[in-house]
């Protein structure tokens, strides 16, 4: 066996996953899976790391949840993640909540490599009728 083949054999295949970040104005959920999405590696939410209900969607709660999820994933041998950010979407809010950006930064700072970041918020193609009535919400 040549020297090149030995080096290739010694080099271990890197394990990558997908970080699904669901961020609404009520909570932030970080769910890390394998690349297929079938196997859950780690799952944390803002509500699991703070006591007060009003703090669940905060960037601080998202940061702590993402840090814990990243630590769990790295213990299981993951070196990097692709990120899918999702807002409630549909007939609800189409913008991610305050915890989305903080969660992405926390995953990177925890030591996970970041691959692709994409927005997977569901967009209605003439789905259900939005709340607010015929004349909309009057402010």
Swiss-Prot record:
Family: Belongs to the universal ribosomal protein uS11 family.
Stored Gene3D superfamilies: Ribosomal protein S11
HAMAP family tied to this protein: Ribosomal_uS11
Record's subunit section: Part of the 30S ribosomal subunit.
UniProtKB keywords: Ribonucleoprotein, Ribosomal protein, RNA-binding, rRNA-binding
SUPFAM superfamilies (UniProt xref): Translational machinery components
Disordered, as annotated region: 117-139
GO biological process: translation
Protein name in the entry: Small ribosomal subunit protein uS11
One Pfam short name: Ribosomal_S11
Matches recorded under InterPro entries: Ribosomal_uS11 (IPR001971), Ribosomal_uS11_archaeal (IPR019961), Ribosomal_uS11_CS (IPR018102), Ribosomal_uS11_sf (IPR036967)
Record's function text: Located on the platform of the 30S subunit.
Any one Gene Ontology molecular-function term assigned to this protein's record: structural constituent of ribosome
Any one Gene Ontology cellular component term annotated for this protein: ribonucleoprotein complex
Presence of the UniProt keyword rRNA-binding in the record: yes
């Amino acid at each position: 066996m040549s020297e090149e083949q030995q080096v290739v054999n010694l080099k271990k295949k890197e394990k990558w996953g997908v970080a699904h970040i669901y961020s609404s104005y009520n909570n932030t959920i970080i769910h890390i899976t394998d690349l297929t999405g079938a196997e859950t590696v780690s799952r944390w939410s803002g509500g699991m790391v703070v006591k007060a209900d009003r703090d669940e969607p905060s960037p601080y709660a998202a940061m702590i949840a993402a840090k814990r999820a990243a630590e769990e994933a790295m213990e299981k041998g993951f070196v990097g993640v692709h990120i899918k950010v999702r807002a409630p979407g549909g007939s609800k809010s189409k913008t991610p909540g305050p915890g989305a950006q903080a969660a992405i930064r926390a995953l990177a700072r925890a030591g996970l490599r970041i691959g692709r970041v994409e927005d997977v918020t569901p967009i209605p193609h003439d789905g259900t009728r939005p709340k607010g009535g015929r004349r909309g919400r009057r402010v």
